[in-house]
Each structure stands twice: as C-alpha cells, then as structure tokens.
C-alpha cells in the first residue's frame, strides 16, 4: 500500500472531484478573484513582511488580538514553524490523526510518541489524559475535530489536556482547521482559552472553509 502523507496530488491522475484535502469543490469565491485582479498593479513589490493588514483582518474575524496572529502558506507550514520554534525532542500525537504532525516532528529530528484513541469508543479521547500524564514530552498535538475520525474533543477532556500540559510546561498545538464547519465554532474554539494558557497555539486554515 502506498503511504499517503497529504492529498491534493491530482496532476498525474484523472480527477473530477478531489475530496482528499477537503477543499471547496465550487472553486475560488468571486470575491477572492476580484481582490486578486484589482490588486495586480502592486504585484511587483515585496509584501509587508509583518502582514499587518492581513493580520488585522483575521484578528477582526476571529475576535482575537492581531499580535497573536501569525500567517503562513497553509496549516502545514505553520505546523512546521511551531516545531522549529519550540525545538522539542519528543512530541505527543494522537493515533489515528493527521500524518503532517509526525512529518513536521521528524523533519526537525524529534521523536513522536502516540497516545492512542479508543477504537471501541469511536476513537474518542477518553483515555488521552491518562496517557499524556505518563509521557516525557515537550509538545502535544490535538486535532479538533480530529482528522480523519471527525470527533470533537469533549469540553472536560480538552480542559484536562490543557491543564496537564500547562502544569508540565508542554506546548499544546490545537489544530482547528475543520472546526469552523461546526455552527458552534465561536463557542467551542480554543480561542477562549488563550488568556488562561500561554502554552497554547491554535492552527487554522483558509482553504477548508472558504
């Protein structure tokens, strides 16, 4: 079996609809196309290295401070950037979950340790906390909702994971790339924990929802 690390490779295949990366099958929104065409006169200049206008726009949409926003070329680049910045020697990753976490960890010479989701309970996170308590790690990835199972992490378990990691100086990387599809996004996003947990990093993506 061929190992799949990321979808979207349609160029050597005949593909009508690509569901491998869960992007919008309707194509680029008209507003995005208009913005590109209407700003072509500035393409010869370097962009603002601090992405000031973009960060302020994202901050307004997400209702967080602009200084907390870091923009990148997709979630995978940001996952790599977090690992590069923290330089952990061991990271916890759920199994099963998105393979990009392990790829980023190994790219910087760190080790991946898996906390296993309960298959008998629909791959829930019920046992995650007890497993994390016994791990010697510097970073923990959580995916909410999890990819590929689609499960949301229950509120009590999510807070428990954040508490465990804060008490042990473990950076929590919360991948919320698919969370906006939930109508309760603003209520259940980890954004509400940013003031209480300075070890929390949230990853989000433009392509999935827009």
Model region roles, listed by residue range:
Residues 1-45, 170:
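N-terminal "arm"/small-domain region of PLP-dependent enzymes with the aminotransferase-like
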Residues 22-24, 75, 98, 144-148, ...:
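Short glycine-rich anion-binding loops that position phosphate/pyrophosphate groups of nucleotides
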Residues 27-32, 100, 199-210:
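PLP-dependent aminotransferase class I/II
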Residues 51-91:
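Phosphate-binding glycine-rich loop
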Residues 65, 108-109, 196-197:
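Short, structured coil segments at secondary-structure junctions
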Residues 85-142:
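PLP-dependent aminotransferase-like
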Residues 123-136, 148-168, 172, 176-209:
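Active-site pre-lysine segment of PLP-dependent enzymes
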């Amino acid at each position: 079996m061929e190992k799949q690390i990321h979808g979207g490779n349609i160029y050597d295949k005949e593909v009508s609809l690509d569901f491998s990366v869960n992007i919008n099958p309707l194509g680029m929104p008209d507003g995005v196309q208009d913005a590109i065409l209407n700003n072509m006169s500035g393409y010869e200049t370097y962009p603002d290295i601090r992405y000031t206008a973009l960060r302020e726009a994202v901050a307004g949409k997400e209702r967080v401070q602009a200084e907390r926003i870091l923009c990148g070329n997709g979630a995978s680049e940001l996952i790599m950037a977090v690992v590069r910045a923290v330089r952990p020697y061991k990271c916890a990753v759920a199994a099963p979950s998105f393979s990009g976490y392990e790829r980023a960890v190994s790219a910087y010479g760190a080790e991946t340790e898996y906390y296993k989701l309960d298959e008998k309970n629909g791959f829930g996170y019920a046992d995650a906390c007890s497993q994390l308590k016994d791990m010697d790690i510097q970073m923990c990835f959580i995916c909410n909702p999890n990819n590929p199972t689609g499960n949301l992490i229950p509120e009590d378990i999510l807070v428990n994971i954040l508490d465990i990691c804060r008490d042990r100086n473990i950076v929590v990387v919360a991948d919320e790339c698919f969370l906006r599809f939930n109508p309760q996004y603003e209520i259940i996003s980890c954004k509400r924990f940013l003031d209480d947990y300075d070890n929390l990093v949230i990853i989000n993506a433009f392509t999935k929802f827009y």
